[in-house]
Amino acid sequence: MTTPDLTGALFEIVARTAGRRPGGDAIALSPDMVVLERPRNRDHGDWATNIAMRIAKPLGESPRTIAADIAKALGELPQVAKVDVAGPGFINITLEAAAAGALAHTIVESGPAYGRGHSLEGIRINLEFVSANPTGPIHLGGVRWAAVGDSLARILQAEGADVTREYYFNDHGSQIDRFARSLLASHLGEETPEDGYGGAYIGEIAERVVEGYEGDIDALTREAQQEVFRKSGTELMFGEIKQKLHDFGVDFDVFFHEDSLHESGAVDRAIARLTELGHVFEEDGAIWLRTTTFGDDRDRVVIRSTGEPAYISGDLGYYLDKRERGFEQNIIMLGADHHGYVGRMMAMVEAFGDTPGVNLQILIGQMVNLLRDGEPVRMSKRAGTIVTLDDLVDAVGVDAGRYALVRSSADQNLDIDLAVLGKRTNDNPVFYVQYAHARTCAVDRNAAASGVDRSAFAPELLTHPTESALLGLLQEFPRIVAQAAELREPHRVARYVEELAGSYHRWYDSCRVVPRGDEEVTDLHRTRLWLNDAVRQVVANGLNLVGVSAPERM
């Protein structure tokens, strides 16, 4: 019996129970009100719910009385072994062994689809992440967003959302000016400009620009030279960024140029729309947006008195452009230095008549520190002053790098110790999880060699405590995925597969799939092979959601 099966049956029972009572019609019952949770003490059953306490007040009866009626009806379900009412009205549910064990068959038959849901079915989501300007290799903070953002996109898609991965960048701003001046200075053998970019990559890009230029670049004026380095240098740097991200397993559907906002008229349309809504005013020759109406600490200049657009004008045009493209939900991932950006963005959303936190969410990520044996890693020789994606991948590989960046909440500072990630021991979390998958595959190979197959399935035989614990965790996977999608927290999936791996290793040490010596193959062995393969599938599904491979051998 799967969690959705039990939840659906419980909802029907609750609806009937409420409907038989005065005031029952006044309760707006919905399936999402019925929540099943794992009891902390497994002696209290497989599942628990507090639904009786949630509906007791409008029904005018005690929670325990309502819980008793619900428990009686639940106890009549053939898959339920026992139902108890505890405390003020908790309902504890114990499933029949066969009903609990049947999940293994369901998972194997479902394959990659197990864990997927429908909570975001049909919703169009724009997920903007990384969005670094092409002035150098991606630093470790951007790499964190690459791993977290791609994982979040996978999880949102697993819940049915139509997700567009988007990368926003400006190839004509002041950072690009500094980048172009740095390239030109490198070519001319001059000192790096005071506000320029250093590192060996500047010389490499400058050389490639010169090699690719058709003609004598030194015959150009300095201004013309700088324009060549600006255009070709940013194209080369951005091409490198795209390739490095692709090699890291991160690809984007849309690369959005800031300039296109002005060229397409999106900024003008946004200002016109906000003017119609009465939120724009003129003062001191400038055009302002009255964001204080919506909780911002001050009103914001949109068009300066010089006629030049202020920074927020691009935000206005970009948000309107996304809404015009049909995105109901927009998620932006930003670094810790953008914390002050949130208030004005949410005020902007409200000024458009939308709902902050629904139509726009902003996720703020914290710093990443790279260590080796507890000591800070030296900066990249190529990038000069930052630790880059290449540094991480060269040290530990794509899988370990991605997993390390995803397994912790993005709003917390993160220390990654390369020495730990290089170990083939249980101290290394990615090894621990991948080894669990490889072990399930080894069990399959050994089972085949010993004549154990899945020709029989007797779930009532899966009664060992480690089997009950393992089945309980397997039941949790769809809920974990849905929760990770709702809360925008991919680390929940990573932590779940770690817990599942630990439970599997304990089961492996206690329960044999392959018979010893001359021992005959029994239905218990065959049924345990189903359970082994169910774990293999769920570990693979979980790792796929965070963009990490599931090796068959290690």
UniProtKB/Swiss-Prot annotation:
Catalytic activity: tRNA(Arg) + L-arginine + ATP = L-arginyl-tRNA(Arg) + AMP + diphosphate
Main location (coarse class): cytoplasm
SMART domains referenced in this protein's UniProt entry, alphabetically: Arg_tRNA_synt_N, DALR_1
Subcellular compartments: Cytoplasm
One cellular component term from this protein's GO annotations in UniProt: cytoplasm
InterPro entries documented for this protein: aa-tRNA-synth_I_CS, Arg-tRNA-ligase, Arg-tRNA-synth_N, Arg-tRNA-synth_N_sf, ArgRS_core, DALR_anticod-bd, Rossmann-like_a/b/a_fold, tRNAsynth_Ia_anticodon-bd
GO annotation terms (biological process): arginyl-tRNA aminoacylation
Any one GO molecular function term: arginine-tRNA ligase activity
Motif ('HIGH' region): 132-142
EC number: 6.1.1.19
UniProt keyword list: Aminoacyl-tRNA synthetase, ATP-binding, Cytoplasm, Ligase, Nucleotide-binding, Protein biosynthesis
Pfam families registered for this protein in UniProt: Arg_tRNA_synt_N, DALR_1, tRNA-synt_1d
Enzyme class: ligase
Subunit structure and binding partners: Monomer.
HAMAP family, per the entry: Arg_tRNA_synth
Family designation: Belongs to the class-I aminoacyl-tRNA synthetase family.
NCBIfam families to which the protein is assigned, alphabetical: argS
Protein name in the entry: Arginine--tRNA ligase
Organism, scientific name: Clavibacter sepedonicus (Clavibacter michiganensis subsp. sepedonicus)
